[in-house]
Structures are given as C-alpha cells and as structure tokens.
Amino acid sequence: MNPGTITNREDFLQRIAKQLGREVKLTPPKREYTHRPQDEVLKGASEEELLETFRMVATRIHTDLVECESAKLDDTLRLLIERYHGARILAENDERISAWAPTTSETFDWWDSSQPEASRELAIRADIGITIADAAFAESATIVQYAMPGRSRTISLLPQDHIAIIPKSVLVPRMTQTAQQLATLDRDGLHSPNGVNFISGPSNSADIEMNLIVGVHGPVRVSYVLVHDL
C-alpha cells in the first residue's frame, strides 16, 4: 500500500452499512443551512451605504481610495503615478485600461502571457502594477481579481505599489455574492476563472508584540480607483 492511499474502502463501508441494516449511500445528502448569517450582512443596504462602508474600511486597511468619473480616469491615474513616483508601470493585458486612460497608458508595459518569464522580469522591476477588479466587497474593502491569460497575480504582487481600478458596478456587500456567482458558473458549465485572488490592501505583518509592518510580503502601497459610472 502506498502512503496516503485508501484501500478496500467500499468493502469497509459495506460491512458498516450491513451492520446498520441499510444500503451504502454514495451520494452525500444535501444539507440546508438552518441559519445563514452570511446573507444578512449589509442586507438591503443601498448603493451609497455600500460605498460608504467600503470607504471606511479601506482607510482601516491602509489603502488609498480615489474616486472619479470615467472621463477623469486618465488624469486620475497620471496623478496617482506621479504621487507614487512611478517610472516603470506594468499593466494587465486588458484593453479597457488603454481605452479608459489612452494618454497615461502610452508608457505602460503590458503583461504578455506568451512570454511569462519576460513579463515576470518586468514585474520585478516595475514601480507600479495596474489591474482591474472583478468584484469589490464593502464589508472588508477587499477586491477580487480572476486569474486568466494576460491577468497574472504577479502584476498586483511584485511591483512596489499596486493601483486597482474598480468599476462601481462590481461593488457587492461581501464575499457571499461572488461565491454565489462562481458557483453558478460551475453549475451551469460556463467558463470559470483559472484562479480567484482576494486582495485587501497592502500586505501586513505583525510580530508577537503586535508591531504592524506594511508591505513585507507584497506591495508597500495600494490604491483603489473607484470609477462611479463604470
């Protein structure tokens, strides 16, 4: 028997079932939750209430939050890049970025999924990584990024700073709504992402004395750019 393997499982279960006087049930029963507190968090909150919660929590997790309309996104990105003294910018390969910021994005490097090693080198040297959030949670000021070609986790992890563009339309109360969406994709046989990344501001670490250090395991600074009309 190889380590970590299970043998004779069916025979074992058959013996137990026989002693209990019933057949072996191979399909697990569907269990309904008696209580579903996850559905009650921010239930019935208005769009403005979700946004206000998101603003408040973003401050707690040491994240800059900038808000603008799509017409001002180009200038907003430029000013943020200047504030962070960014000279080398790496963006995920999403045509929406160049469409929303045609002038500022002219100097960006773009993630090339056909050349992952070269793209990783760009990420290592980049001052800022720019991505687009697929969802955002008001409860924890967490953003969600789906992993797929051209949209590597490396872009938001290796550069010194990270700027995430958040269309306001993707703001939801909490993780529950995104989990339900992903479950629907799997259940309906639709294409689901290769991976799901949850990002809650810059990386944090604390020692036994609770001295907080920001930016040890990832970006030193994270900025959310929330765009109201997207």
Swiss-Prot record:
Belongs to the LutC/YkgG family. One of its GO terms (biological process) is lactate metabolic process. Is involved in L-lactate degradation and allows cells to grow with lactate as the sole carbon source. The gene is lutC. This is Lactate utilization protein C. Pfam families: LUD_dom. It comes from the Bacteria. It comes from Exiguobacterium sp. (strain ATCC BAA-1283 / AT1b). HAMAP family: LutC. InterPro entries: FTHF_cligase-like_sf, LUD_dom, LutC, NagB/RpiA_transferase-like. Coiled coil: none annotated.
